UniProtKB/Swiss-Prot annotation:
Keywords: Antimicrobial, Bacteriolytic enzyme, Glycosidase, Hydrolase
Enzyme Commission number(s): 3.2.1.17
Keyword Transmembrane helix: no
Protein family (similarity comment): Belongs to the glycosyl hydrolase 22 family.
Protein name stated in the entry: Lysozyme
Any one GO molecular-function label of the UniProt entry: lysozyme activity
Role of this protein: Lysozymes have primarily a bacteriolytic function; those in tissues and body fluids are associated with the monocyte-macrophage system and enhance the activity of immunoagents.
GO biological process, one term: defense response to bacterium
Catalytic EC class: hydrolase
Amino acid sequence: KYFATRCDLVRELRKXGF
């Protein structure tokens, strides 16, 4: 999951609160 696509990364980042 750490090497997911940029879309996935942005999704998790926003989830996080970034």
